Amino acid sequence: NQDFFIKMKPFENTKEGAGIVEKMIADVLADNHQFKYVVIGMESTGFYGVHLANYLSTSELLAPFSVRVYCLNPKEVKNYKKSFNDIGKNDGIDSFVIADFARVGRIAIKPWRGSQYLALQRLTRHRMHITECITREKTYMLNNIYLKFSEYALLRNGEHPFSNKYGATAEAILTEFTTNEDIVNSSIEELVEFINSKSKGRIADPEETAKIVQAAARNSYRLDKCLYEPLTISIASSFNCISSFEKELKAIDKA
């Protein structure tokens, strides 16, 4: 029978449990001066292993032994385990396999650098989350725009009156005119003045833009009047959400 320096026992995945593991390793090192450095291998388990890996890799007790923590791909460990004949499966055996995997130098990845890695990972994933929120909100809003202003929603890029479909002028057209009839009943001069005001004079041909918007309003499906206000409120709310998400995106990019 082979003797082990650490007797196998379970511990909770908590700060207290991590402290127990740290002390077990530190006690072995204190009693066995032949060990010059420590390699800790653990299967990568997503969030569940993050705190333990961080704790051990930054341990002051283990620091004098150049502790290196490796979060291993479970598939690699599983494949390595196949090299053992008639070996069972339990936590003790799996721990032995991981330790042997490290002992024979099979680890090819970089040691865990939790703080730097986790910071970048969280920021990158949150940025993706915000981007997906913007995309999802725009898709949701387009459904409401189609219900309220069907022809406007169907205009393609080459036909669309605004270069930015989600800009201030587009938002004003969709939220400040409650019904399509309000646009149809406005004169071209009134629409030109409105467009110039909302775009701050940045639209090259406001009269042509006004004509396109009015034609789209004229050709759109008509709804019962009771539907226009809820749709307008929903569209305005979506614009507010998109604006907030875009502000958050800028803040993340500056981080």
Q: What does each model-identified segment do?
A:
Residues 1-255:
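A detector of single, family-specific signature residues
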